[in-house]
Amino acid sequence: MQAGKYLPRHAAKLAETVAYLQALEAPGKRQLVVWPVHCVLGTWGHNIHQGLGEAIARWEMHTGLTCNKVLKGQNPMTEQYSAFRAEVPRVDDARTALNQDLLVQLAAGADRLLVAGEASSHCVAASVEDMLGALPNQRLKRTVLLTDCMSPVTGFEGLAEALVLQSLAHGLGAMAIGELPV
């Protein structure tokens, strides 16, 4: 973009876009990936998979509790892989800041925290990285990655493998859903 090969759709956003890309690609951050349009509110890609949705509904009926569904990626001016924060939080949008309320709920929550979702190489990995930095060790040791309930973006399998190794090193479990004790 700095060389002028690519430009934002709105020329007035050039300086903001360049600053954003520099912050996004700062050491330890991610490189910009231009994704196809996906997970748009109101489309199947944004919805909970039907089988999982039915299982959640049964659990809610059985327990009388409500599953907390968290929206992310609501600001089109920043990437938000993690369920907890945007890659580059915006000062003009609190929804992009670290979701402390969600972290507090998870820290004090159920006996076991199960992690699943798409994609293990990006969104799940970013969410777990945020959990590793924010949740107490006793909570992390009661957290399990459901390895057959997630998959990587093609070409990024190494990031998904790194997620599992990093999680195990921090005391999280990793197993297939059929291996879960009842």
Residue ranges of model-derived segments:
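Active-site-adjacent betaalpha module
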Residues: 1-182
